[in-house]
Amino acid sequence: MKLRIFEIVFAAMMIASIGGATAAGAQSSPAREPVAPDSGPKTLLEGILGSTEKDKGKEGSDGEEHLDADRPHFPEATTTVGKGRAILESGYTFTKKGDSFLSHTVPEALLRVGMFADWFEFRIGQDTLHQRQTVEEVTATANGAKDLYLGVKLALTEQKGWLPATVVIPQMTVPTGSAEVTAGRVLPGVNVDFGWEVIKDVFNIELLVANNFVQDELGNSRHELATGLTGAFQLTKKLELFAEWDAFYPTAGASPASRHYAVAGAVYFVTPNLQLDMRAGVGLNHNSNDFLAGVGFAARY
């Protein structure tokens, strides 16, 4: 009988020892961090040259960042939306020059869709124009849909030190607009955007160099070089303030003089996938409009 009791006690002690060792081992072993799924190269250069293991380890380490919309800055974002994601942007802009010029543009709709790879983005946009212009006491109006915008954005490089993040946007408008507004022809162009994160999560610099054919005041097409330089300050995780200098340099056509604007605004991130924006600006020379203002939003899906 005593032997039987001893065997039972011994067996219980062995079971308890094994269970304790297992629990201790589980507690001492560090929990494995979830491995981020491989979403492929973020830029075209990375897709060609490949990424390092160090770069891969950085992916997915933080929570989802807020969307990087093209609006309301004149320079576009130096990121693409990502494969399988989409961003819809929309807004309204009011422009005025004394009593001689007044325009409203709405909805400034731009749909950006990530396709094929994280570095490739398809873009389609539509807008309407309501404009009144007086020249030598003769007033003309133009109202209706503008030409359809089509383009792609290619993320070329991410920032490496002082080398900027870079994207290129081949684009065009096709003559689908109303009779009073359409250019009546395809107008091609290409934008190149550069971005520097100077102080992480605090201060960014953006630069746009745009070469596009546009419609002039006489309805003819002309080449125009445009530049935009923006400084963006992230005051909090939800609030960004920015200031920029935008310039337009026609190379021919009815208005060969340049136009310059100083613009400032704010972006409020309601959620990581929704932002609201507002901006206002003034013309810096005689050829520019006196004042512009606008509001808008962007949503990521």
Where are these regions (language model features)?
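Absolute N-terminal positional cue centered near the fourth residue
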Residues: 4, 16-17, 29
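C-terminal segment of classical bacterial N-terminal signal peptides
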Residues: 15-23
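Transmembrane beta-barrel domains of Gram-negative outer membranes and organellar outer membranes
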Residues: 27-301
